[in-house]
Regions:
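Inter-lobe coupling/hinge region of RecA-like P-loop helicase motors
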Residues: 1-14
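Polybasic, low-complexity RNA-engagement segments
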Residues: 10-12, 20-172
Length: 172
């Protein structure tokens, strides 16, 4: 309903591809340097199962279970999961690293609905857990991450993804 521009919608773009003769060749794999010891140590501390392939673009580290493909002239935003950045001899994980459901985290903490609401507003949680980065979960599903000093978890959810002050988490 309302998909056409004359009906007030934005319209759609449709493209028709024509297959050229012959069989498509195998796409070349994207070469990457090996991940450093700091990143490898961090990933082993956080995950039970590590990604099979890594790609490093400047200081950004990406991970995937299938090989990265060199698309040459085709503009691709990113392949795989953005794991984080290597900054001054330390690894800083990304929010997307903790949002991937396939990863089995070693360091995670389950919270109540009230704690989830506070955390989604950007508050610090007063909760004891292991020191370092932890996946913050509700009923086993990660919704964010934080850095713990053992007694509290500092919020690392990107500010743009946090809830507004007057909004609250409701589960019916």
């Amino acid at each position: 309903r309302r998909i056409f521009p004359m009906d007030g919608g934005e319209g759609h773009f449709i493209a028709k591809f024509k297959k050229q003769s012959g069989v498509a060749g195998k796409l070349p794999a994207l070469k990457s340097k090996k991940i450093d010891k700091i990143t490898e140590k961090f990933l082993k501390e956080q995950l039970n199962t590590l990604p099979n392939y890594y790609y490093i673009d400047k200081d950004r580290v990406y991970g995937m279970d299938v090989p990265f493909v060199d698309f040459k002239k085709v503009k691709v935003l990113r392949q795989g999961v953005y794991l984080g950045d290597v900054i001054k001899n330390r690894f800083e994980p990304s929010h997307s690293f903790y949002m991937v459901a396939d990863f089995d985290y070693k360091r995670k903490v389950d919270v109540t609905l009230e704690e989830m609401d506070l955390f989604m507003h950007g508050e610090v949680l007063q909760k004891e857990c292991e020191k370092g980065y932890v996946a913050v979960c509700f009923k086993g599903h990660p919704f964010g991450f934080g850095k713990s000093d053992g007694k509290q978890i500092k919020n690392k959810i990107p500010k743009g993804l946090r809830l507004l002050p007057n909004s609250h988490v409701n589960i019916d």
